[in-house]
Amino acid sequence: MRIRQEREKLAAGDRLEWVSLVFGSAPSPLAEPISRLRRAVEGRTTLLLHPLQRYVTYRTERLTRHPFLHAEMCSPPPEMDLKSRFRWRDFFSNGGTLFLDACPQSHSGNNEDAVADSWKSWGKSIFPDTGWSPLNRGHELSYSFYLLDKRMFLGERGTPVSLLEQDGRVILVHNRSRRWSWDTLKNSTVSVNLNEPLLEIHLRLYINLLMLMLTGDYKSDQLHLPTILLRRR
């Protein structure tokens, strides 16, 4: 009985929640484990992770409860009033990161490009003096986490991902391509090895994002990841 309790305690401590925001009055879907990604991630890192897809209703007063939030850009962004702006700033100053993602095909509507652009402007309005920059081959997120200094091959044009940084830290990620979305990866058949090249790069990029979420200072001092996690906790 005690051994089982210890295992459950360890599993809870290593559980990785990918928290997606739900907008409007619709009830939040139930949380669901992502076993395929768990096996693929564990094959590439020193951690035993238990990825869990979780959904929370959008409330600005609850933002700081989470270190990382994911929002699919299926509708125009919510109003950014003064109170919301300062609550988002509190979220980021507490180490939070927000990922603005392409809308899945099943929920997409008209004017997808215009909606994606409006979210980009919405994100910039939180810190008007900052600007978006593309995720290119020179950025630290393009270096594969588990291969140390090896770059991922992102191609000449990089990815359709833009970053907004504050004080040298990524606080906002904007992806306008459904092909590179979290929904596409989550529903793909991934493995520890032998993935097709594009899917492999897709998976590596998201592992880097997960490590960014967990550590808060991604690869900046080359410490072993468990040490960084203990320090952050």
Spans of features found by a protein language model:
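Aromatic-Pro/Gly-enriched surface loop or interdomain linker
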Residues: 1-68, 75, 188-233
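Short, surface-exposed loop and linker segments with low hydrophobicity and enrichment for Pro/Ser/Thr
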Residues: 9, 87-88, 166
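Short, surface-exposed beta-strand/loop "edge" segments at domain boundaries and coil↔beta transitions
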Residues: 27, 78, 180-183
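Helical hinge/lid and interdomain linker segments adjacent to catalytic or ligand-binding clefts
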Residues: 31-117, 175
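An acidic, glycine-rich "communication" segment
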Residues: 105-207, 232-233
